[in-house]
């Protein structure tokens, strides 16, 4: 049995709590990737999560999952390959998060959590992916970059 623990909620409004997500230890079938999805974004509503081939029109697709805050899926196996992860408010097709193309490698075993976006861009969430050895963020493809320029030399004028 695997146990993953998230701190969710917000310190400022006293909603901070622990969320324990469990899963059975399951081998990934050859040619597949395995994911477990967690809605850990306290400031996001109930959402539909689409995991499709890149550039697929989601208006003709069913979401992989509909999730409200603190929901977690079971382990889901999908064929290894390139995907696009898009999140919409539940029942709508207006995309509020778009991963762009993401490769789910053969044998990958990922826990992917939607977390509150504290970076750039308008998306309410970013995705945090963990594979047991480390973690990385999957930013919204439309987020852009934040740049801060500091002039710290007093003898040089710009």
Feature annotation, model-predicted:
Residues 1-156:
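Intrinsically disordered, low-complexity polar regions and short flexible loop motifs
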């Amino acid at each position: 049995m695997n146990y993953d623990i998230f701190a969710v909620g917000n310190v400022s409004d006293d909603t901070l709590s622990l969320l324990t997500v469990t899963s059975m230890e399951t081998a990934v079938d050859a040619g597949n990737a395995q994911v477990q999805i967690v809605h850990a974004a306290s400031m996001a509503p109930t959402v539909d999560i689409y995991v499709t081939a890149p550039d697929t029109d989601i208006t003709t697709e069913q979401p992989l999952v509909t999730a409200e805050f603190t929901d977690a899926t079971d382990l889901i196996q999908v064929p290894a390959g390139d995907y696009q992860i898009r999140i919409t408010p539940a029942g709508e097709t207006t995309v509020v998060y778009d991963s762009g193309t993401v490769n789910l490698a053969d044998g990958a075993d990922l826990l992917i959590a939607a977390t509150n976006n504290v970076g750039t861009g308008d998306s309410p969430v970013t995705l945090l992916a963990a594979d047991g050895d480390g973690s990385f963020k999957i930013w919204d493809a439309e987020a852009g970059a934040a740049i801060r320029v500091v002039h710290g030399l007093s003898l040089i004028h710009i």
